Each structure stands twice: as C-alpha cells, then as structure tokens.
Amino acid sequence: MLNDLISDGLTRIRNASMRRLETAKLLHSKVVEATLSILAAKGYVESYNVIEEGNKKFINVVLKYDEYGRSVINELKRVSKPGRRVYQGKDDIKRFKNGYGTVIVSTSKGVMSGIEASKAGVGGEVLCTVW
C-alpha cells in the first residue's frame, strides 16, 4: 500500500525527466493535482490531464524540456514527509534559490506557491521545492 502519493508523484516526474520521457503517469489525488497545477503555472511542466482507467484515476503529465533537450526541472525535492512534517509561518516563508525556485505550501486556503502564501498572509506545511 502506498502511503505518500506526493512523494511518489514527485519521484515519478523526476525519474521520467532523467530518462527524457515525454510523459509521466501519476496516481491521482487532489493534493497531487493542485501541486501539478502550480508546476504548470510556473512553467515546470507543459501540461497535465486526469484520466480514468476503470475505477482508478491517474494523472498524465507532459514534461517540459529546453531547446537542448535538458529538463526544465533541475531539482524536485519533497520537504515535509509523513515521518517529519515541516511547517512554516507566514513570516518564515522565504524566497527559494534567490527567486529562481518555487516552494509549494499546503495552507488552510489550499495548495499554493510560497509567494502566493506570503501575499495571502498564511503559512502551512511545506510540501516540496522545485527549481
């Protein structure tokens, strides 16, 4: 049984980009879908769509590469894990990699980037970082 769908999804994206695959197939959850919407909005993935196979849902992610064939994602790292949760208050959320990276935070107002959480004045659980 799989306990952490976010870590599994990030690992599948990381492995697919290292193998230079066009797509990655993830298990569906609302948090994974919200995380992917942020990654798509920030330009780290081309697009994603939810597909149903029988009674199960999956997310098909189209990965993005630069003109030299390198993945746009340099590092995709899970911060808060089931064994060690990491929370940051609204004043503690800082820029990541001098503004070149993105922090994805799960707040009481939904999953959003660190910049959006700071502007909204909310803190929360730091799900992952990407740059």
From Swiss-Prot:
Family matches, as Pfam families: Ribosomal_S8 (PF00410)
Its Gene Ontology cellular component terms are: ribonucleoprotein complex; ribosome
Q: Which UniProt keywords apply?
A: Ribonucleoprotein, Ribosomal protein, RNA-binding, rRNA-binding
GO molecular function annotations of the record:
rRNA binding; structural constituent of ribosome
GO aspect biological process, one term: translation
Q: List the disulfide bonds.
A: none
Stated role: One of the primary rRNA binding proteins, it binds directly to 16S rRNA central domain where it helps coordinate assembly of the platform of the 30S subunit.
Q: How does it assemble?
A: Part of the 30S ribosomal subunit. Contacts proteins S5 and S12.
**Similarity comment:** Belongs to the universal ribosomal protein uS8 family.
The protein's matches in NCBIfam families, at most eight in alphabetical order, are given as:
PRK00136.1 (NF001109)
**In its UniProt entry, what is this protein called?**
Small ribosomal subunit protein uS8
Name the species this protein comes from: Campylobacter concisus (strain 13826)
